[in-house]
């Protein structure tokens, strides 16, 4: 890698700020999940917590996108970080005063859901303005690689930290990390780009919708992804009680379990360039079939170590599907339409997550956790098998391509 980018003070500030933000955000998510489950013992309440994050996040992502370029991206990011830091003082102070209630966590989730959609697109947009064009790929590699490393380390570290110092001091650590992230971002020297006449938000969004539904490969891959996202929504509700109640583990075990998927994704992303295949459809949808089987496995096994191994396998399989999926989209969509179409794709796929959260919260209370893992695993595997078996879906193979290398990775289980 070109090390000259590390001599750029603005980039180093962005790099460090993003890494600390990822760590603080992951710790905060851990704390919120544990507090809600300890206060209520209800998987439905845990699901409500995630809904209160995702619903505002999805809605605000729609309306905020066209306006990001009009504002200072640097100050959007700083505002996002400091707002997140301050809102975590609500449960922290309530805990110290002995008056912590579930609604305090719900307020935190709503606010975080509103400000998080601001940070990510602003971060992606500001990077080309603070590094030279020839250093952009190196800068993105540093940013993306560090973020994925934090996603791997944070669950393990979060489990250990909460287990040893408690949720109250961990919330204080979250506040410090997010506030520090904002201060680091102050060191960036933003170069504002003059804006020409822009279309209205509605006009831009309509363009994205029309193009998205015109490309059937993108549409159907989005539908397959939506089934996976539905499963992710379900697991957001049941992963914590699965480890602590079903497998009788502690918060350290939960952290290791949650780290398994991003670790697998990193492994999968390293392997993907070395794997040759004849049919893109068979490779991608076959990966989803195996991914569905990992859910079924979680519904059967009794050992935490096996559950962690299964999550690593799931991460590898999801990398195979997701990286090819995003690369197909990047190659099919014209550059001037990329943001609009990608936002439509993201909103449609992410909408499946709240549905999964509601489903998981209700069904887990009625039927239990193990049957739910088996159910979502069967759904993902069966839908993927249909895509493999039915000749209609041959268009997913597309034109012959010697290689399909990723431009961007998404390391979440989605």
Predicted regions mapped to residue ranges:
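Transmembrane alpha-helix termini and helix-breaking/packing motifs in multi-pass membrane transporters
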Residues: 33-39, 91-97, 153-173, 245-246, ...
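C-terminal transmembrane bundle of multi-pass solute transporters/carriers
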Residues: 59, 76, 80, 90, ...
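Helix-loop junctions on the cytosolic side of multi-pass membrane transporters
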Residues: 125, 129, 171, 175-199, ...
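Helix-loop boundary and gating motifs at the non-cytosolic
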Residues: 2-56, 210-259
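Helix-breaking motifs and short loop linkers at transmembrane-helix boundaries and internal kinks
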Residues: 40, 72, 94-95, 99, ...
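MFS-fold secondary transporters
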Residues: 28, 37, 90-95, 112, ...
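Juxtamembrane intracellular "pre-TM" segments in multi-pass secondary transporters
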Residues: 1-11, 190-223, 407-414
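Substrate-agnostic recognition of the 12-TM MFS/MFS-like secondary transporter fold
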Residues: 12-29, 53-68, 72-87, 104-162, ...
């Amino acid at each position: 890698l070109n090390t000259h980018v590390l001599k750029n003070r603005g980039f180093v500030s962005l790099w460090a700020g993003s890494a600390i933000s990822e760590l603080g955000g992951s710790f905060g998510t851990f704390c919120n999940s544990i507090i809600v489950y300890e206060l209520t013992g209800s998987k439905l309440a845990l699901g409500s917590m995630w809904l209160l994050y995702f619903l505002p996040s999805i809605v605000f992502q729609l309306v905020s996108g066209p306006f990001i370029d009009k504002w200072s991206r640097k100050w959007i990011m700083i505002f996002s970080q400091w707002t997140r830091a301050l809102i975590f003082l609500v449960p922290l102070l309530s805990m110290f005063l002995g008056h912590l209630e579930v609604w305090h966590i719900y307020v935190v989730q709503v606010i975080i859901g509103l400000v998080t959609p601001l940070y990510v697109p602003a971060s992606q947009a500001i990077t080309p303005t603070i590094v030279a064009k020839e250093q952009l790929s190196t800068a993105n590699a540093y940013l993306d690689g560090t973020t994925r490393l934090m996603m791997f380390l944070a669950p393990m570290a979060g489990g250990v930290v909460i287990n040893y110092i408690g949720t109250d001091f961990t919330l204080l650590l979250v506040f410090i990390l997010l506030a520090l992230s904002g201060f680091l971002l102050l060191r960036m020297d933003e170069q504002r780009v003059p804006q020409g006449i822009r279309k209205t938000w509605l006009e831009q969004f309509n363009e994205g919708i029309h193009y998205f539904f015109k490309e059937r490969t993108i549409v159907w891959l989005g539908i397959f992804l939506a089934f996976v996202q539905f499963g992710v929504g379900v697991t957001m509700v049941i992963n914590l009680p699965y480890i602590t109640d079903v497998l009788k583990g502690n918060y350290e075990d939960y952290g290791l379990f949650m780290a398994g998927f991003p670790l697998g994704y990193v492994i999968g992303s390293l392997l993907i360039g070395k794997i040759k295949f004849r049919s893109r459809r068979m490779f991608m949808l076959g990966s989803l079939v195996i991914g569905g089987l990992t859910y079924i496995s979680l519904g059967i096994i009794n050992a935490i170590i096996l559950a962690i191994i299964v999550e690593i396998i799931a991460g590898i399989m999801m990398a195979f599907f997701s990286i090819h999926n995003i690369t197909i989209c990047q190659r099919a969509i014209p550059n001037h339409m990329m943001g609009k179409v990608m936002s439509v794709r993201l909103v449609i796929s992410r909408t499946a997550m709240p549905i999964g959260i509601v489903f998981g919260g209700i069904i887990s209370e009625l039927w239990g956790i193990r049957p739910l893992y088996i159910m979502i695993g069967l759904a993902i595997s069966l839908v993927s098998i249909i895509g493999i078996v039915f000749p209609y879906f041959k268009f997913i193979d597309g034109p012959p391509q010697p290689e399909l290398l990723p431009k961007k990775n998404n390391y979440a289980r989605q």
